[in-house]
């Protein structure tokens, strides 16, 4: 699934002749495996329906948003989400917000569906945390190497 998602993401970002369709075929295969409708069928009743892939590609297109959402869902417990968000440079959108979760102390289905805001605060320091520090030993070996900003 990760290869199909990466392929779909690359095709959508490339946004050239036929690549949007190729990428969405891979994404729809993942959705089909999970028993879900295709992207077009799922989004046809939305406020801004997707009736054609053309015009929805590129880094800021609707298809990019969809493939990112699918990636977060499909790779949920594989510890990939944190790295994807950093790679997409969306730390402020996903990390510097209140943490929400389920009410796990509930005794019925209605209680579980209640969203709780947790007191924990996650701080993501942008742009610093988009990069990792280069180990000091490596920087000292090469006088031409410069440490990443703010480290």
Describe the role of every protein-language-model region:
Residues 2-151:
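Acidic/polar-rich alpha-helix caps and helix-coil junctions
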């Amino acid at each position: 699934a990760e290869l199909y998602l990466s392929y779909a993401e690359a095709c959508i970002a490339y946004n050239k002749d036929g690549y949007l369709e190729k990428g969405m075929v891979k994404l729809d295969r993942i959705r089909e495996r999970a028993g879900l409708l295709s992207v077009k069928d799922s989004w046809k009743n939305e406020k801004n329906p997707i009736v054609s892939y053309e015009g929805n590609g590129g880094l800021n297109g609707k298809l990019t948003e969809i493939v990112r959402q699918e990636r977060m869902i499909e790779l949920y417990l594989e510890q990939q989400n944190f790295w994807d968000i950093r790679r997409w440079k969306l730390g402020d959108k996903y990390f510097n917000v209140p943490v929400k979760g389920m009410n796990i102390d509930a005794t019925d289905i209605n209680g579980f569906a209640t969203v709780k805001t947790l007191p924990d605060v996650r701080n993501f320091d942008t742009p610093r945390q988009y990069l990792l520090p280069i180990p000091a030993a490596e920087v000292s070996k090469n006088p031409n190497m410069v440490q990443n900003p703010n480290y």
